[in-house]
Amino acid sequence: AVPRGWPNGKLYYLVYAASANQHYEPGYRQAYIEGLRNALGWLEQRGQRPKRVFFVSSTGVYAQNGGEWIDETSTTEPTGYTGQVMLEAEQLALGCGFPATRVRMAGLYDPVRPWMQNQVRSGLRVERDPPQYSNRIHRDDAAALLACLLQTDLAGGNLEDCYLGVDD
C-alpha cells in the first residue's frame, strides 16, 4: 500500500532508497521488490511520468571475493539472497517504462551505524594474503552522489544506467 501523504503534484524524479527492516529473504523481498512495485504502481495510478527513476542498489550483486576489482560492467552472479533480491529489483526498475538508473552503493557507514569503526577500534586485522577488500561509502558521500546524478539529469546531461557508489 502507498503511504498517506504522498505528493499530489507533479513528480519529476523517483529515488527509491529502501532499507530492509528484517534481514532474511522475505524482508528483503518486501522492501526492495514489493516496495518498488508499490511505488511504481502509485506512479501509474496517479498518471505520473517521472523524468527518471533512480534505484539505490548494492554492490552485493557482485559475487567476486578473491581480491579482484569490480566496476559497473563486472559480472553479477550473487550467491546470497540479498544480492539476488537486489538484482531482481534492479531489473524491475530497468523495466518500469521510464528511464532508470541503478546506483549500487557499497556498505554505508556513519556515526549512527558505527559497526565498521568499532571493528577497527577493537583491533580487527585484515589478512594480507590473499588480500581482502571492503567496499564502503560514507552516508554523506552516498547522498552527494545521488544529488550529483539528479542535478546532471536535470541539466540535460547523459546518465548511464548503472553507477557504483564506493569511497576511494
Which residues does each predicted region cover?
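Short-chain dehydrogenase/reductase
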Residues: 29-33, 68-91, 132-137
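Conserved Rossmann-fold NAD(P)-dependent oxidoreductase catalytic core, especially the SDR/UDP-sugar
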Residues: 38-81
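Substrate-positioning beta->alpha
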Residues: 85, 115-117, 128-150
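Glycine-rich Rossmann NAD(P)(H)-binding loop
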Residues: 128-132, 159-168
